[in-house]
Amino acid sequence: MSADFPSSTRPENRPPVKNPVQNPVLNPDRTPDQTPPAANPSNTATLLLAHGTPDRLSEMAEYLRNVTGGRPMPEHVITELQQRYTQIGLTDSMPGQGDDGLPLGPPLTRWTLLQARLLQQQLDRQDPAQTESAGQRVYVAMRNWRPSIAEVVAQMKADGVQHARVLCLAPQNSRTSTGLYRRALMAAVGSSFSVDFVSGWADEPLLAQAFAERIWPVWAEACAITGTRVPILFTAHAVPCRTIMTAVPSQPPAHPGTPVPADGMQDYGNLQTPDPYPVECKQTALAIAAALRPVGLTDADWFFAFQSQGIAGAPWIGPTVPDTLKALADSGHKGIVLQPVGFLCDHVEILYDIDIDFKQQAADLGLQLWRAESLNDSPTLIRAIQAALHHPATRLSADPESHPGQATEQPHSRPAHTRA
């Protein structure tokens, strides 16, 4: 393990970035009589789409209705999620702004806006003679919260945007992520402007490099501390089994906790039009592992699982993280390094599910758990986003097919693991 990846300085030790992303919708202090910044001369803009998260605990019920397409959630589910968000710092006070002009509230919002700002600054530094994306304006919209896709699209129309390159900040393509984002976007856009939509970027080399840069120092530290080859566990968010099946009455029952092979889809049902999500998640993990080979990682050193299976009664894809932790402990391992590869920044599925719940489960099994720092403000991630956005000829594809019962998300949380 003699090779090294450059390590980034943590955000709190960095000087604040002075110029926020120029999106009036994101600026609560902007009054209607203020003139918005001029649209890019090319009339082409970049739009980043994210999941969204509530700003305050009291907004949890409204947020969950957005996630489920209007279906109300039981009170005990709302309370459970409020408790989890409380443990990662969310309160009932409206978040203020930091010295850098970004909101101090939920980390998902703050990091997403910072990623957009860094992308904007990267585009502003580039020479228009060298790249067509130089100076393009960057917008951010949230599918399940504010600023909503409809709000931001309205602002883009007012700014004179005629063409948009759009990227979902969930690299792996799925009906319940990319498909829903695209449908919401096109419903808002209508015929107002043209859209190049990046349907998935799980195999972007710079994305794998960004993840590798984050996990390498943690893995090296864990191996040095334990004196053993500590296994790496890559994870991605689970989805309901029905998401990756076609909606036909003759489907056989699916079961959670069953591994999805790297080389294809498991037979979860009548796969006339299989959802690519499980395969793309594994592709990202394979690419990160390949990037780590120069520093000594072998195929025997890493594993893959799906995390944060939901509260819905229907089965979710696996294997689960708890099952994988137990299997590794039963095999004699004393530590594990975990890296979620479907998330680009800190949020509840990382700060609670991994840092609190999984860490305790690992400790109960005699495992020490390390987690790689999230990508957050990784410069390599920002380069990966631009690369994915501006190679549309190899990235665009048709919207994933929508099937009955698959057009809404499920809340991405489940009751805490029961411990003896």
Q: What are the residue ranges of the model-derived segments?
A:
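Active-site-proximal alpha-helix that buttresses catalytic centers in soluble enzyme cores
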Residues: 2-15, 29-420
